Amino acid sequence: MPYLVLPALIPDIRPCYDAYFAAFSTDPSGSILLDILFPSGVTSDEFRKAHTNGTLQWWHTSETQYTYKCVDSETGEIIGMALCDVFVKPRTEEERKMPEIGWLHGEQRTRAERVLDGLWGARERIMGGRPYVYIHAFAVDPKHQGKGAGSALVQAIVDLGNTIGLPIYLEATPTSENVYFRKGFRRVPAEIAQVVHEAAVLGTKEDVEVPLMVKLPQGVYEVKVDGRKLGEVWAEWQEERKQQQQQQRQEQVQQQQQ
């Protein structure tokens, strides 16, 4: 079935975040993040009303953040959403400061800051104050996953990046990484930036590495990462991926011969 990706409107806030919370609640990494950011839960009517009102207020003030909805063209139902910041001009250090987590306090706030500080720091090191597109959130209702809605959402943002000539940056999860990879995103090499959340902070058995990913727009070669042209880094990623694929094929052949 065809999916439409459109700018979200004010009446879409609640259904967009219905898809968001449903998707994150059923994803292993997403559920951990929800527990850290919203430790009191996300299902109560009181929370959802406050969240919707807070989102509406943010929409009235944000100058860079855009929300997209993915619509089932047969039913008109909103089944997914994407939230991205579009930074079309350079930003100062003051403009790039991490917002405070004002709704949390004490140990809960400290825990959330330990998680978000690492993500914020990595993004700062990779992209800095340069113009780029940042995919802040991406979700498809679990009932509609695996049918092309996620691909449609990502493609819409890829098209945006190509149109305005800006790279796209995001923090993926282990379950979403392949969706982005198929659209041309590649992981940032660990020597440039790496985020590993400690198990003690997440409440997991093992540390968790976050896939940091970048997609270059068509024809962009002058954006730099740590003083290097992103085009050069991109070529390295492509070569590394090619070598990995060759190694995987060799291992498969060896296994078949055994």
Model regions and ranges:
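Conserved acetyl-CoA-binding loop-helix of GNAT-fold acetyltransferases
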Residues: 137-140, 146-159
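Conserved acyl-donor/pantetheine-binding loop and adjacent beta-alpha core of acyl/acetyltransferases
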Residues: 31-32, 46, 57-64, 75-145, ...
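Hydrophobic beta-strand residues of extracellular immunoglobulin-like
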Residues: 66-69
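Conserved GNAT-fold acetyl-CoA-binding loop/helix
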Residues: 28-54
